């Protein structure tokens, strides 16, 4: 097993070979020290957001084959620092991450006192007006103030009036210091005279409204049917019917010239006159104007602020009863309120903690693993056979233990028949690669299936002495009857097999009724369910049809019959006769071998495997040379033989590149591609890969990948911007009120018609048969 180790800045990456799942983090540090010249004490290793600590194995952190572990080098510690202080210093400075606030910051109230004083002054609505001697407005006067970001008007009060030099060098400008009544957290805001005006107080009657008038209206740009904020608007037209009155206007968004045209004003009875500067009638007129607090609508859209209605949104999230506000806690995560006596268990007093989280939002601190702490015990791994085994054998070096690095998503796991893009004769070095390709999903088990559905694939590895392999047909022995306790992979037959689990699944593939007593034979065996067959090199000693190395996909077979009999071990076993039923030639035939050459099929290795093997061989050669030099000899050292030199020296010249047979499209497929005019550019890109043979299918998969689900598009919607998305994915996006293309954010509009691209769906179904299963 091998992994990649990369520095945090990404500048240096090295492969660490000869690892096991049981390799300790301490041992890994030693190997990293040799490659990066960094002492183990200065190494901080991270994998998937977790800091790897000594005492654990890489299996504890679920590190997979060829995965990347990040290395952060600690700064060299000064010699004067005591060892007990070392850890405390490294926690913040070396990681490059900021820690919590300092004590001085926590105790600081700078910035809050101004807001609190502003809020306190806001409570004195009856304060006397003070004339500053310049400007239209007095201190403590109620006005309407514009928010410069939104362009909307809000109720405010002037707290200070000052002068500032004009930008053009003319007369001094007057600056009004105002605070918004409903938003005290904004503090005091400085505004020019054009952004402040007397509090609106005059409501226009219907007959007074005329096109071209500039008025003040309530409008919600996000949801026009709901109550929003107050904007200036120019009336464009009005219409009156027997049942309703409608006003349409242009919403003015500040002085920048931005506007929203032809907007329907929902609240026609709340259209206000814009007061001119200096037109305030007196101190009481502004504060008692119709435009007062609450004019932006009820705070709770569920209960409409009805005090008689219970509401779990604006009040206690458990009982919803509007009482005891002094005994309510507000969750700092979800902003929901909870009565102290409604919690489970109930609280007798309000907690002193600054932050409080409800039971749904709270994270259990005991389950959080902090940097420098050991991992918590995993219940799942505690149940594994390896956890309770007393064996000292290192089981973590096998390729069956490394886990998949990718997963086949072209077809579902319960797919019958060939996997698109995997021709007969495909070779893999390890079983885990067969699993990644989707041909045979289990890493170790010989049969993949479901006892209530059937078997999808099997591996012929010569594991049972009763197996007989004749190439186009073979007799297969079922699974079970062996004691595999203690994490064993194989054992001698120790009891009778039963027609259950995978044995029953394989029996369901036979075109005959299931008989768990005597077995059954199909009258028309070709009508049975197909089984993908993989032959392993482990069966080479029993069968000449097995590959010399690795695992080979040999095509589709079908179950002819199955029956119980006494095996060579003396126990009852279930036998299955399978015959080949595939259009592609078998890989051991002349035609099959020629096809393999034409398709350019060679052994497939895991990523980084060849480099790891080469490095291991080089290390072994260097070690042998060192041993020879250290061995005392009387004469001169013998010269290497010619055969050894040829073996060690690299092959001269580049190997001749084999010509791969091009992928052939049927006339129907070519016609469908031609009909898909919307994706002509993408098809032109994909068609360039026809010369690569089976890799053409992989190219099509890459080109027509849905950006949302990362699978081949199903029921594809080709958008205006020439992107393809699954209809279900786009519907989910629209349901979340996101009306843009998931790929480029082009605005599709709320009423976008989702028409399925039928030619594209048809060609994808032919290239990837069965990929639509489970996606309806």
From Swiss-Prot:
Annotated positions for site Histone H3R2me0 binding: 325, 328
Positions of the UniProt region annotated as Required to promote base flipping: 443-444
EC nos: 2.3.2.27
Location(s), subcellular: Nucleus; Cytoplasm
Disruption phenotype: Embryos have a small head, eyes, jaw and an underdeveloped gut. Moreover many mutants display diminished yolk consumption and uninflated swim bladder as well as embryonic lethality. DNA methylation is impaired during embryogenesis and embryos display defects in lens development and maintenance. No fertility defects are noted for heterozygous animals.
Polar residues: bias regions: 93-102, 114-126
Region described as Tudor-like 2: 208-277
Domain of life according to the entry: Eukaryota
CDD domains, per the entry: PHD_UHRF1 (cd15616), RING-HC_UHRF1 (cd16769), Tudor_UHRF1_rpt1 (cd20455), Tudor_UHRF1_rpt2 (cd20457), Ubl_UHRF1 (cd17122)
Ranges of Basic and acidic residues composition bias in the record: 103-113
Zn finger residue spans: PHD-type: 297-364
Catalytic activity of the protein: S-ubiquitinyl-[E2 ubiquitin-conjugating enzyme]-L-cysteine + [acceptor protein]-L-lysine = [E2 ubiquitin-conjugating enzyme]-L-cysteine + N(6)-ubiquitinyl-[acceptor protein]-L-lysine
Record note on modification: Phosphorylation at Ser-649 is required for gastrulation.
Site (Histone H3K4me0 binding): 314
GO CC list: chromatin; cytoplasm; euchromatin; heterochromatin; nucleus; replication fork
Region (Disordered): 88-126, 278-298, 617-660
Region (Histone H3R2me0 binding): 331-335, 351-353
Keyword Acyltransferase: no
Organ and tissue specificity: Expressed in proliferating tissues. Highly expressed 24-48 hours after fertilization (hpf) in rapidly proliferating tissues, including the tectum, retina and brachial arches. Preferentially expressed in the liver bud and expression is maintained in the fully developed liver. Also expressed in the proximal gut. In adult, the highest expression is detected in testis.
Annotated stretches, region: Linker: 290-299
Pathway per the UniProt entry: Protein modification; protein ubiquitination
Task performed by this protein: Multidomain protein that acts as a key epigenetic regulator by bridging DNA methylation and chromatin modification. Specifically recognizes and binds hemimethylated DNA at replication forks via its YDG domain and recruits dnmt1 methyltransferase to ensure faithful propagation of the DNA methylation patterns through DNA replication.
Free-text comment on this protein's domains from its UniProt entry: The tudor-like regions specifically recognize and bind histone H3 unmethylated at 'Arg-2' (H3R2me0), while the PHD-type zinc finger specifically recognizes and binds histone H3 trimethylated at 'Lys-9' (H3K9me3).
Name used for this protein in its record: E3 ubiquitin-protein ligase UHRF1
Lineage, top ranks: Eukaryota, Metazoa, Chordata, Craniata, Vertebrata
């Amino acid at each position: 097993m091998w992994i990649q180790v990369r520095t945090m800045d990404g500048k240096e990456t090295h492969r660490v070979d000869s690892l096991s799942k049981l390799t300790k983090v301490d041992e890994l540090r030693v190997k990293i020290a040799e490659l990066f010249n960094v002492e183990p004490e200065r190494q901080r290793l991270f994998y998937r957001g977790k800091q790897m600590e000594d005492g654990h194995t890489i299996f504890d952190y679920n590190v997979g084959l060829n995965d990347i572990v990040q290395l952060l080098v600690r700064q060299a510690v000064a010699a004067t620092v005591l060892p007990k202080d070392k850890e405390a210093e490294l926690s913040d400075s070396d990681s490059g991450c900021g820690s919590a606030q300092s004590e001085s910051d926590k105790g600081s109230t700078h910035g809050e006192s101004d807001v609190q004083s502003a809020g306190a002054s806001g409570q004195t609505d009856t304060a006397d007006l003070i004339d500053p001697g310049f400007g239209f407005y007095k201190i403590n006067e109620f006005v309407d103030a514009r928010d410069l970001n939104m362009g909307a008007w809000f109720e405010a009060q002037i707290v200070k009036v000052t002068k500032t030099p004009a930008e053009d060098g003319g007369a001094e400008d007057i600056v009004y210091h105002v605070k918004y009544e409903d938003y005290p957290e904004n503090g005091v805001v400085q505004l020019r005279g054009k952004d402040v005006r007397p509090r609106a107080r005059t409501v226009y009657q219907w007959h007074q409204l005329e096109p071209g008038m500039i008025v003040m209206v309530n409008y919600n740009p996000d949801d026009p049917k709901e109550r929003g904020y107050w904007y200036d608007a120019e009336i464009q037209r009005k219409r009156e019917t027997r049942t309703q009155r409608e006003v349409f206007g242009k919403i003015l968004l500040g002085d920048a010239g931005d506007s929203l045209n032809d907007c329907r004003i929902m609240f026609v009875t709340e259209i206000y006159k814009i007061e001119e500067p200096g037109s305030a009638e007196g101190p009481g007129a502004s504060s008692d104007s119709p435009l007062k607090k609450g004019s932006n609508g009820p705070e709770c859209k569920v209960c409409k602020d009805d005090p008689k209605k219970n509401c779990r949104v604006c009040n206690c999230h458990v009982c919803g009863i509007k009482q005891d506000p002094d005994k309510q806690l507000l969750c700092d995560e979800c902003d929901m309120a909870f009565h102290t006596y409604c919690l489970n268990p109930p609280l007798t007093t309000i907690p002193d903690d600054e932050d409080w989280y409800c039971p749904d939002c709270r994270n259990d601190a005991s389950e959080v693993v902090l940097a420098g702490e050991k991992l918590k015990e995993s219940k799942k791994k505690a149940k594994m056979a390896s956890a309770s085994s007393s064996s000292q054998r290192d089981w973590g070096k096998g390729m069956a233990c490394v886990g998949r690095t990718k997963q086949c998503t072209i077809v579902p796991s319960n797919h019958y028949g060939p996997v698109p893009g995997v021709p007969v004769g495909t070779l893999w070095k390890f079983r885990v690669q067969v699993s990644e390709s989707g041909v045979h999903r289990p890493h170790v088990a010989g049969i993949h299936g479901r006892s209530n559905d059937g078997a999808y694939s099997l591996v012929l590895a010569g594991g049972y002495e009763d197996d007989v392999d004749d190439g186009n047909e073979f007799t297969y022995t079922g699974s079970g009857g062996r004691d595999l306790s203690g994490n064993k992979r194989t054992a001698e037959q120790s009891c009778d097999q039963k027609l259950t689990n995978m044995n029953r699944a394989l029996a369901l593939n036979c075109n005959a009724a299931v008989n768990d007593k005597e077995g059954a034979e199909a009258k028309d065996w070709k009508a049975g369910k197909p089984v993908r067959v993989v032959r392993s090199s482990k069966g080479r000693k029993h069968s000449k049809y097995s590959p010399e190395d690795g695992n080979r996909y040999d095509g589709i077979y079908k179950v002819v019959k199955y029956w119980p009999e006494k095996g060579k071990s003396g126990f009852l076993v279930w036998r299955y006769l399978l015959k080949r039923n595939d259009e592609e030639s078998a890989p051991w035939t002349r035609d099959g071998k020629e096809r393999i050459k034409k398709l350019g099929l060679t052994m497939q290795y895991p990523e980084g495997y060849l480099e790891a093997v080469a490095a291991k061989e080089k290390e072994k050669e260097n070690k042998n040379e060192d041993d020879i030099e250290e061995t005392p000899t009387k004469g001169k050292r013998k010269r290497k033989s010619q055969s050894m030199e040829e073996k060690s020296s690299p092959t001269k010249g580049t190997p001749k590149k084999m010509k791969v047979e091009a992928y052939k499209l049927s006339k129907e497929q070519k016609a469908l591609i031609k009909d898909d005019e919307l994706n002509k550019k993408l098809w032109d890109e994909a068609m360039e890969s026809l010369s690569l043979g089976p890799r053409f299918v992989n190219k099509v998969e890459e080109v027509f990948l849905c950006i949302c689900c990362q699978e081949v598009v199903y029921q594809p919607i080709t958008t205006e911007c020439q992107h393809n998305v699954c209809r279900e994915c786009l519907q989910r996006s629209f349901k979340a009120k996101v009306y843009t293309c998931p790929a480029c954010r082009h605005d599709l509009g709320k009423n976008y018609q989702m028409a399925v691209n039928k030619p594209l769906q048809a060609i994808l179904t032919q290239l990837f048969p069965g990929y639509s299963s489970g996606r309806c």
